[in-house]
Amino acid sequence: MNATFSKRRKSLIVTAVAVAAAGGVAAAVVPAFAAGGARADHAGHAGGDAQGIVSRSGTAAAGAGGTVLAASLRGANEVPVAGGPAVGDKDGAAVQFVKVKGDKVSVAVAWRGTGKPTALHIHQGAKGTNGGIKVDFGGLIGKESGLIGKEKGKGNGASKGHSLTGTVTVKDRALLNALKTDPSSFYANLHTAEFPGGAVRGQLHKVTVAKFDFRDALDNFQASVFKGKQIYECKPAEGGGYAFAQRDVSAVLGGRIAHSFVAPNSGTPQWIARDGSAVTGAVLSKTPNGERNIPELDLKATQSGKHRGLLADTAEILRLNTVGGVAPAGSCTAGAIVGVPYQADYVFING
């Protein structure tokens, strides 16, 4: 990425956060800054031995290549244990990237709305369950030598966001292979002093299209739905009768990114930033997320707006942590249109 434009783009991201906060947007863009903290307990999750870690570095591994994973962390994803320590910071959020290359596992995480991390792990466990620690990034906390963003060189003084990058060595080949081939069976978890059992967590997902130098991982960002509806129209159904089918989507994301179809019934989603940069999306894969929630998506992004701006480098989009938005069931009156509220996190990844 051009250095001058990279600085301009980061400025745009920060501006988007400030605008969203002023407008009362609770879930806005997660920017890339840096801060640290001290370790604490992680009781409340099954134990583990952080298999195979033999060394740690405060700098994320450079270069492309390897398997890149992403997670959008929310307090609502935490699973409490009866009698266990506090979990689930309802105000917290984080976006995390992980790269597995050889025996090196790199992490880049940015958080907001929650305290400084006291522990940072990858656990093995499905959504809704607690699992053992498999990779422990705790040794990187307080060693953030690779600061990213406008606050580079200013230590831990960033007030608009915090981030951490680094690399650990893992010698367990079976674990490394499982991370690469079945990432959704693992989750990222960030602990704080207030929530020692886990403040925010999110399942890992493979980044399939976008290619970027992992040192620039936190140039990617997360924007959550501030207000949105999945829009359905009653249409003839296969096998006879009528049923609701997708007509459109209408949503405003953090940073005031507008989300809709390029035209009703087109089936092609688009995201338009206030600066005129924009992308359309084509679904690569769908992951069910419960009967009451629309599926999570991996989408290939195609540029459709200005060549400079917030979305100008976006090559892939992950729709994660979906809540609601499912089409009404049963019969309906032909032509009827309904909007079903939904929530989701969108992770915009550069190519």
Residue ranges and their predicted role:
Residues 209-231, 238-351:
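Primary mode marks residue(s) on the alpha4-beta5-alpha5 output face of response regulator receiver
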